Amino acid sequence: MDELIRRIAAESMIKHIEQENCYHLIVASGRQEIQLYENNICYHYCLRAGEIEIRRLSDDIVVSYLKAPDIVGLSTYDKSQVYHYIKTISNVELLAIKHENFYRMIEEKKLWQEAFTLSIYMLNINYIRDEALASRNVYGIVRHYIEIFWSMEEERSRFSIFEFILSRTNISRSSLNKILKDLCLGGYIKMERGKLIDKKNLPLNY
């Protein structure tokens, strides 16, 4: 699904929520944790500015990286369905909407198409991730995340390739270090102080 379509859908939903004034604004700095379920209330969040990670509650693994504009919590219905939390990466602005207000607004404003578009986009991301993690080959998983990281032109200048991969997998640091070192020696990638600065076509097998 085209990124532009996702962005338009998110902007449309955020615009209607702002007009309805059915939210409270959260302004947070980086490295803050925000829950989807708090004080017996389910929340949906509109990311109006900044960057966040969606992390699993069970093991703190990053399952998604989001940049504004975006919507968080479309699949959340009650506390039994909350498996993730938000961790901010940068300074952010989030519009927090109670579950009942969120779906009432979707119904009244006929925003089901936008909600569907964003849900499908997130499902596709999850399918791609799960397909990569289904591989029993550690190198195959590392290769997958190197390719993803390389496509994130702005982010790769700020983040370490080590932390990017380690936060998204259960691969040991020693195993990852060996693979990255061998790829550097083979001339497939180039790193400086943990930053990925160049990448050639990676071998399919290792």
State what each model feature region is:
Residues 147-206:
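Phosphate-/nucleic-acid-contacting segments
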Residues 25-26, 35-37, 41-47, 63-64, ...:
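His/acidic/aromatic-lined binding-pocket segments of jelly-roll/cupin-type domains
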Residues 1-33, 71-72:
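Cyclic nucleotide-binding regulatory module and flanking cytosolic helices
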Residues 25, 34, 50-56, 93:
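Short beta-strand segments in beta-sandwich/barrel cores
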Residues 49, 90, 192-193:
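Residue-level signal for tight coil/turn positions that link beta-strands
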Residues 113-171:
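Polybasic "coupling" helices that flank or enter modular domains
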Residues 63-119:
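Cyclic-nucleotide recognition modules
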Residues 41-58, 68-70:
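Glycine- and acidic-residue-biased ligand/ion/polar-headgroup-sensing regions
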